Curated annotation (Swiss-Prot):
Taxonomic path: Eukaryota, Fungi, Dikarya, Ascomycota, Saccharomycotina
Keyword Transmembrane helix: yes
Main location: endoplasmic reticulum
GO molecular function annotation: unfolded protein binding
Membrane topology: Multi-pass membrane protein
GO process annotations (BP): sterol biosynthetic process
Lyase among keywords: no
InterPro entries named in the record: INSIG_fam
Extra facts: Present with 3390 molecules/cell in log phase SD medium.
Source organism of the structure: Saccharomyces cerevisiae (strain ATCC 204508 / S288c) (Baker's yeast)
Protein name as it appears in the record: Protein NSG2
Keywords: Endoplasmic reticulum, Membrane, Phosphoprotein, Transmembrane, Transmembrane helix
Length: 299
């Protein structure tokens, strides 16, 4: 039996607890002694997993709590939800990504301007090549360049003769180089998707060299007739299309442009060899412009 002079250890423990903990501890558990602001701040950081390098998001959260303290004391727990936080951080993210989007837009504009310039210069060079293409029979100089005069006449008619002729040739080069990329976006065939690796700078240079070799070979070889030269060139064009590209959109573009050039100058065609001659030259030219346009618009 315990002596009356000795203190009861159970009562002593209860007295210490009543002195160190609030009286409402039994009702609210440890929420009374926990800092509410610190708890909300830690909870927000855990839920969003804020990166330490993106200091602007931390500043957004800190400024939110600062305004809340300044207006009405501590921020109530139920007013800070994940949706509100996502809105705040999304606004901060948009502000951070705005300079990069502006830079990307500027780069895209410069990229397309570069493509337009190169295609326009190629159109002018293509006209000069057509003027020097001939054989020793019916295919005389300047004969292949007649379809290109249609674009120049159209530009002069639209501008009342203000624009120079070389600008019309540049517009034709731009149109020739843009037909195949437009057809690629329209059809989106498996052949086009599988031939992306062919659209390289090396492939473009090879196609240009092939065109120059074929056109000047027509001039140097002694053909028995113009029909023989045009027929051999037509068979070679099919081989070059299969070797350099092989896509349906490229074939359709080359055929349509070749037929269109023949129709535009049907009054000047007096022999079947001349029809094939127009078809061969503009088929191969469309192949070269198609490769160049694909490369410029996709790189």
């Amino acid at each position: 039996m315990a002596n009356r002079g000795e203190p009861d250890p159970k009562k002593s423990t209860e007295s210490i607890c009543s002195l160190t903990k609030p009286q409402l501890y039994s009702l609210y558990d440890d929420d009374v002694v926990r800092s509410e602001d610190n708890e909300i701040y830690e909870e927000l950081k855990r839920s969003v997993s804020i990166d330490s390098t993106k200091y602007s998001r931390d500043q957004t959260i800190d400024s939110t709590f600062y305004l809340a303290h300044k207006v009405g004391g501590s921020l109530p727990r139920n007013t800070v939800s994940s949706n509100n936080l996502e809105r705040i951080l999304s606004a901060s993210s948009i502000h951070e990504n705005f300079p990069s989007r502006t830079r990307q837009t500027r780069q895209n504009i410069l990229h397309y301007l570069q493509a337009v310039l190169i295609l326009s210069l190629s159109g002018f060079a293509y006209h000069e090549l057509s003027r020097n293409l001939h054989d020793n029979h019916l295919l005389h100089p300047d004969f292949a360049s007649r379809p290109l005069l249609l674009g120049v006449k159209l530009c002069n008619w639209l501008s009342n003769g203000v624009l120079p002729n070389w600008l019309g040739y540049g517009v034709e080069g731009l149109l020739f180089g843009s037909v195949v990329p437009i057809l690629d976006n329209i059809f989106q065939t498996e052949v086009v998707k599988s031939s992306v690796h062919h659209d390289s700078l090396t492939s473009v240079i090879r196609s240009i060299n092939a065109m120059l070799g074929v056109t000047f070979g027509i001039r140097k070889i002694q053909w028995n007739s113009s029909l023989q030269a045009a027929g051999a060139w037509g068979l070679l064009n099919i081989i070059l299309w299969l070797f350099f590209d092989g896509s349906i959109s490229m074939l359709m573009s080359c055929i349509c442009i070749g037929v269109g050039c023949c129709i535009s100058c049907y009054k000047d065609i007096i022999d079947g060899s001349q029809f094939l001659y127009f078809m061969d030259f503009y088929f191969l030219g469309s192949l070269m412009f198609g490769k160049l346009g694909r490369y410029l618009y996709s790189h």
